[in-house]
Amino acid sequence: MKYIEFDESRPMDLVLLGRVAIDFNPAYNDQVKEEFKPLKKVHMFEKFVGGSPANIAVGVTKHGLKAGFIGKVSDDQFGEYVVDYFDERGIDTSQITKCTNGEKLGLTFTEMLSPKESSILMYRNRIADLQLHVDDIHEDYIKNAKAILISGTALAESPSREAAIKAVMLAKKVNTKIIFDIDYREYNWKNADEISIYYSIVAKEADIIMGSREEFDLTEKLIKEGMTDEESAATGRQKMQRSLSSNTV
């Protein structure tokens, strides 16, 4: 078995690229208990930073790792909230830039009907995180990281998809390990073929892929439908062996 080795001399443990949003959950504290009721009857919410890569950034810093975030936020109070939230937790925000054409952060409202029943109401029109541009991606920043995590939602639309692919290309160039978090969200995509095209581009270059069986099926749709977990893993091993062989002098 071949293990993935990270360059321990690099100052940043993980750089994350992609979706950041604002989550509103029914308030539940000593003063207010709003859970287990329809969303239309909830009057008070608690606000958090959300989005898979944002949550991972917070999680790894809690475990003592150094993380940075590449992303786009709205030029308003919510955008400032995200940057402050990250700064307070020790996440580097030097690569977070503000939108200039009025795009807004995504807003997500959680409905909790019971301990086992929940759903979300999401607003993602003219969304800030998908405005990330190739000019926002810098080789030196990626070169300083042991690994970069690419969120699949960043591939849903231009100009973000080109920015994400540029980050992947630069990571390969400077030998920063690539983690692909498929992070499938149906509302971001127009059709299944488009999903497979862009997911597979990044998956082929990734050292680690995070996803469910459904997400792997979406990625593999135009390559080979109906693959099992074992077949997907074997394909990944073959790709890694080819990569290791090509890097051998």
Language-model segment annotations:
Residues 188-249:
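Conserved phosphate/ATP/ADP-binding segment of small-molecule kinases
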Residues 2-92, 116:
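Glycine-rich phosphate/adenosyl-contacting loop at the front of the ribokinase-like
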Residues 170-177, 246-249:
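A short helix->loop->beta-strand "cap" motif at the edges of active sites that frequently abuts
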Residues 67, 93, 178-180, 210:
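Hydrophobic beta-strand scaffold residues
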Residues 66-150:
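Conserved N-terminal subdomain of the carbohydrate kinase-like
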Residues 159, 163-174, 197-205:
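Catalytic-core regions built around general acid/base machinery
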Residues 20, 153, 182:
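Active-site metal-binding loops of divalent metal-dependent hydrolases
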Residues 9, 141-143, 200-203:
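A short, aliphatic-rich alpha-helical micro-motif
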